[in-house]
UniProtKB/Swiss-Prot annotation:
Listed Gene3D superfamilies: HUPs
Originating gene: cysD
Purpose of the protein: With CysN forms the ATP sulfurylase (ATPS) that catalyzes the adenylation of sulfate producing adenosine 5'-phosphosulfate (APS) and diphosphate, the first enzymatic step in sulfur assimilation pathway. APS synthesis involves the formation of a high-energy phosphoric-sulfuric acid anhydride bond driven by GTP hydrolysis by CysN coupled to ATP hydrolysis by CysD.
Name the UniProt record assigns to this protein: Sulfate adenylyltransferase subunit 2
Subunit structure, interactors included: Heterodimer composed of CysD, the smaller subunit, and CysNC.
Annotated keywords: ATP-binding, Nucleotide-binding, Nucleotidyltransferase, Transferase
Amino acid sequence: MVDKLTHLKQLEAESIHIIREVAAEFDNPVMLYSIGKDSAVMLHLARKAFFPGKLPFPVMHVDTRWKFQEMYRFRDRMVEEMGLDLITHVNPDGVAQGINPFTHGSAKHTDVMKTEGLKQALDKYGFDAAFGGARRDEEKSRAKERVYSFRDSKHRWDPKNQRPELWNIYNGKVKKGESIRVFPLSNWTELDIWQYIYLEGIPIVPLYFAAEREVIEKNGTLIMIDDERILEHLSDEEKARIEKRMVRFRTLGCYPLTGAVESSATTLPEIIQEMLLTRTSERQGRVIDHDQAGSMEEKKRQGYF
């Protein structure tokens, strides 16, 4: 009798197949590591794909310098424990201009420090394929993106000029200067991610678990007071509104642009139970998603992941 795979094992097998395909097809792949839960799952799958050997490609963090401090500590610990070949890139032009999310706004900050920073790094190291942890259930522009997402020589995405993907057959042919973004987790849901993290014992950033944290409510979003830099951009009236609440994060990005959610979920089973009952998007707290109508698709057209 043929054993039947659970849906998580089917997703795992599909993702491992995609990762191995890219490693075999492309000359210089890289795995982007944003330190979040999806990156944690993708990295775990990649290590499984090539176990007991080491990853045949580096991992890269495009650093905006505005991530949560706990994210940086977690990244450094994972690199040391797993022996990862980590590349960290910060856009030097953005640093020279003093780009930050407070003075320049979320759209400018994201474009310079994330999109342009990513394009710089891909060009600098000549990567022809880059793994990312995006999923189709996250956001509508990602829902129509292929597993192999083709980009032109300027790293731009044209949703009308993508190749068909039949079953598990992927066309990796690219011209000189072109590249692909690869999404092994395309068919996973947020609930799948949490269930897999629980079953596999994958370490994640503690910010995903509820705890008492200092936050301020700005435009309906709970922003965590992560370091002293945010205080420089708050008025005395705003500082007086800082309070401690029991919160956690469903998604992690630059801390001034990422909202927390009120929650009492302090364990993985409690988070999974919360996911079964929630009726809101995990990206509701991402300020960059609300810059304008269709902003995520426009960012992706310009080279954003």
